[in-house]
């Protein structure tokens, strides 16, 4: 912002060092109170899950908005949550297990006025972090999208520009439509 002179006049900034800061500490290991960065990221666990599961914002899958657990719960009316959770658990991703979850997104003022599948029962998964130091959010999101793409090719709709914007390029979308293996989809 400053380097590109987006604001005028340019402010004079002063860097203030934080005493006792440990860069590899989790937020809840500090004495800093949690302030949600978004209405749909109410807690630290959601913030940890969000980077991977936000990919579903570029699809017709509910990312859990309109529920108490956005991004922790994902699904659609046509998903078999038991099969999806089994598929994902078979990948044996570190620090996470997946459990079947059914939920009904509803409007929540100030958070989600018109969630995907509003007032419709959705089935899918809940992401349970078992070890946040080993959990890999992007791998979880990519393999979940990969699994749904392969399980429901005629039901899953991907908004290509939306997914590409979230991913930063078209490489994930291209790999999905080329039908790469699970191992190759994780090469990013």
Short names for language-model regions:
Residues 1-19:
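Conserved, well-structured core segments that form the ligand-binding/active-site neighborhood
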Residues 75-187:
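Conserved functional hotspot residues or short segments at active or partner-binding sites
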Residues 3, 56-61, 169-171:
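Noncatalytic linker/hinge segments flanking ATPase motor cores
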Residues 8-10, 64-69, 120-122:
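Short gly/pro-enriched beta-turn/loop segments at secondary-structure junctions
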Residues 20-98, 105:
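Glycine-rich, aromatic-lined ligand/substrate-binding cores of catalytic
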């Amino acid at each position: 912002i400053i380097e590109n002179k987006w604001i005028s006049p340019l402010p004079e900034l002063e860097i203030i060092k934080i005493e006792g800061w440990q860069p590899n500490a989790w937020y809840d290991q500090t004495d800093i109170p949690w302030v949600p960065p978004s209405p749909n990221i109410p807690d630290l666990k959601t913030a940890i899950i969000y980077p991977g599961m936000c990919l579903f914002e570029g699809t017709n899958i509910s990312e859990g908005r309109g529920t108490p657990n956005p991004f922790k719960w994902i699904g659609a009316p046509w998903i078999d949550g038991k099969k999806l959770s089994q598929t994902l658990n078979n990948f044996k991703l570190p620090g996470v297990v997946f459990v079947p979850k059914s939920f009904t997104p509803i409007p929540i003022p100030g958070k989600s006025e018109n969630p995907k599948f509003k007032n419709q029962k959705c089935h899918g998964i809940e992401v349970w972090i078992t070890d946040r130091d080993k959990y890999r959010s992007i791998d979880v999101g990519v393999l979940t999208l990969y699994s749904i793409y392969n399980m429901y090719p005629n039901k899953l709709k991907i908004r290509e520009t939306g997914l590409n914007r979230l991913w930063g390029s078209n490489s994930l979308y291209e790999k999905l439509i080329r039908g790469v293996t699970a191992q190759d989809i994780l090469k990013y």
